Amino acid sequence: MPASRLAAIQKSTIVRSFALLERVAPAVGARWAEALWFRIPSPRGRRDRLAEPGRPFQVQLYGRTVVGEVWGDEAAETVYLVHGWGGWGAQLDAFVGPLTGAGLRVVAFDAPSHGASDPGPEGPGRSTILELADALAAVVAANGPAHAVIAHSLGATAAAYALGRGLAAGRMVFIAPMADPLPYTRMVAGRLGFGERTRTRLVARIERRVGASMSAFALPAMAGRVATPPLLLVHDRHDTETGWSDSAAIARSWPRARLHSTTGLGHRRILRDPGVVAEVAGFVLEPSAARPWRAAGTRS
């Protein structure tokens, strides 16, 4: 649930209702909060495309259609673009030109219930991290090995989770990732006006829904459980959706990770900033031994 949507909800009677339910019926409050947690926001900030439309493709997932686009030579190494919660594949199309111009192939897709893809098992306007991770795995299976994956926001969580389920990638780029969803439930509780009685029940409902502990999606802890290719983290210090400290925590935990920080780009404009695009493209293109890796947690 993005901070922008939480801000809108804060102004409504929903907050007063959650406060009452915390006292008299926390289980009902948790059910309401769960419904909000899995709801996809309306797309924000759609702009003109920076890249010409690619060649369309479709893959089947859960008996439904996931759509995407491909740019570049079919025989080239492939870079996958993964959008975040409420996003869409072409949201990351600023990376297409530099990468295809350097001889790489680029694949983007709309996750279930996002963009032009069919709704997933959760139904229209709803999704889970698992659906994003499964969509990435299905798209890679259909389009070939991943030279690199560039993922934004919650898409980074999905990409990291996919690594733990067998996805192989030569390099990873996480732009404005969330380090751990569990602390975010406390932020949601504070903004929506409910306390620990409701929040603990909300966490239990989320875990039952996805079939995994929320700790399974904590990126710093994943470093000890998954294959960790070289990782570039990019995060703005003024991001109000996911904090810069999230990327710093991931960088301290993942081997062969470095953090590139920006100022004033926020959570979405960072995807189109020329300096960020150049930094990411340079990382994706550099030979594995071309640049010495600094200790995890240092910044470029």
Regions found by a protein language model. Give the residues of each.
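Hydrolase active-site cap/lid region
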Residues: 167-212
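Short beta-strand/loop motif that positions the catalytic acidic residue
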Residues: 226-227, 232-235, 239
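Catalytic histidine-centered segment of alpha/beta-hydrolase-like enzymes
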Residues: 265-275, 293, 297
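Post-His helix in hydrolase/transferase enzymes
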Residues: 271-286
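Alpha/beta-hydrolase active-site loop
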Residues: 124-147
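Conserved alpha/beta-hydrolase "acid-adjacent" motif
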Residues: 240-246
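An N-terminal hydrophobic leader/cap segment in hydrolases
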Residues: 2-60
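Conserved alpha/beta-hydrolase
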Residues: 89, 96-120
